[in-house]
Regions:
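C-terminal transmembrane helix and the adjacent membrane-cytosol boundary/short C-terminal tail
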Residues: 171, 217, 221-227, 266-302
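Short helix-to-coil transition segments within interhelical loops
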Residues: 83-88, 125-126, 185, 195-214, ...
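Transmembrane alpha-helix signature in integral membrane proteins
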Residues: 90-125, 279
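Generic hydrophobic transmembrane alpha-helix motif, especially the helices
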Residues: 80, 84, 114-115, 124-187, ...
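Transmembrane alpha-helices
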Residues: 99-115, 204-236, 283
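Glycine-rich helix-loop "coupling/hinge" segments at transmembrane-helix boundaries
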Residues: 153-157, 184, 233-276, 299-302
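Non-cytoplasmic
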Residues: 148-152, 160-165, 169-175, 219-254
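Transmembrane alpha-helical segments of polytopic membrane transport and secretion proteins
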Residues: 1-46, 285-302
Length: 302
């Protein structure tokens, strides 16, 4: 009997070893693919602003310069994205709008991240009534219609960037707070936090030095999604005429200027729109790569 069991045990051991080897190879392949995804996303989101800086140095074309003798030109070497109804070079306007869109996206996302992480960490670490108050506020913010919320701030501050900055920041922090609080509930029970308390470290030092660094990873993924969302929101508001005001170029307003000619001159709204999509895909790839690398089971969509 013992002799019969020995071969079966050996076979089971070999099968287990092969399964473990397959899992290791799969994990290694996923980590490599996540790195490729992150690099590709970075190439896109860095390449667009770099091009917006370098290309105007090579092309002496002003974004607001009008040429009524060259209106509605097809894409060409001289005008890769064509010209609009008053003869302005569309590519020059897209590149002129790039710094503004990135600035709004990064500034509002960073502000939301800082506010949300602090409030979420406080709620998760201390719990009790403070946790209840903060999380009920988060529930209210998330339940409120996003675009209506931002439009309310624009109504208060007037059309332009001020209301957009405030609206995007005030609304966006709730998502970071919810994720941070969920992570903090687990982190506060870890042994290194208990050891820090035993050593008599202050609560602020425990939070800043030991707890917060361990809740930031999932927030990086949320930050990529928020960046995409904020850039798209700015473009949407400018498309509707309540965002960036003329003559300042903005991706959404450029698409709005070309929508009238969609059937006859399709490139006017389509090519700037593709730039918006490309940037959104770039940030989403970075977020997906981070999620894969650290094992988070959610994905970003544009």
């Amino acid at each position: 009997m013992a002799a019969a069991e020995a071969p079966s045990s050996a076979l089971a051991g070999e099968e287990g070893a092969r399964r473990a080897a397959r899992l290791r190879r799969r994990a290694l392949a996923e980590r490599r693919w996540s790195l490729v995804t992150i690099v590709l996303g970075l190439a896109i989101v860095v390449g667009v602003p770099v091009a917006s800086y370098v290309v105007p140095l090579l092309r002496d074309v002003q974004p607001n310069a009008q040429d009524l003798t060259a209106t509605l030109q097809h894409p060409s070497v001289a005008h890769p994205f064509g010209t609009d109804n008053v003869g302005r070079d569309v590519l020059a306007r897209v590149f002129a709008a790039t710094p503004l869109d990135y600035q709004v996206g990064f500034a509002t996302t960073l502000a939301s991240l800082m506010i949300g992480v602090v409030l979420g960490a406080v709620a998760g670490y201390f719990g009790g009534a403070l946790d209840t108050i903060i999380m009920r506020l988060v529930d209210v913010m998330i339940a409120f219609p996003f675009l209506v919320f931002v439009l309310a701030f624009i109504a208060v501050f007037g059309a332009g960037l001020t209301g957009i900055y405030v609206g995007l920041t005030v609304f966006g922090w709730a998502f970071f707070a919810r994720v941070t609080r969920a992570e903090m509930l687990g982190v506060r029970e870890r042994q290194y936090i208990a050891a820090a308390r035993t050593l008599g470290l202050s609560t602020r030092r425990i939070l800043v030095v030991h707890a917060l660094p361990n809740v930031l990873r999932p927030n990086l993924v949320i930050a990529m999604a928020t960046l995409v969302w904020n850039i798209l929101t700015l473009a949407t508001l400018s498309f509707l005429g309540v965002g960036v005001q003329p003559p300042q170029a903005e991706w959404g307003s450029i698409v709005a200027d070309g929508q009238t000619y969609l059937l006859s001159d399709w490139w006017l709204p389509t090519l700037p729109g593709l730039v918006i999509v490309l940037v959104g895909v770039g940030f989403s790839l970075i977020g997906d790569g981070i999620a894969d690398r650290f094992g988070y089971d959610f994905r970003l969509t544009v």
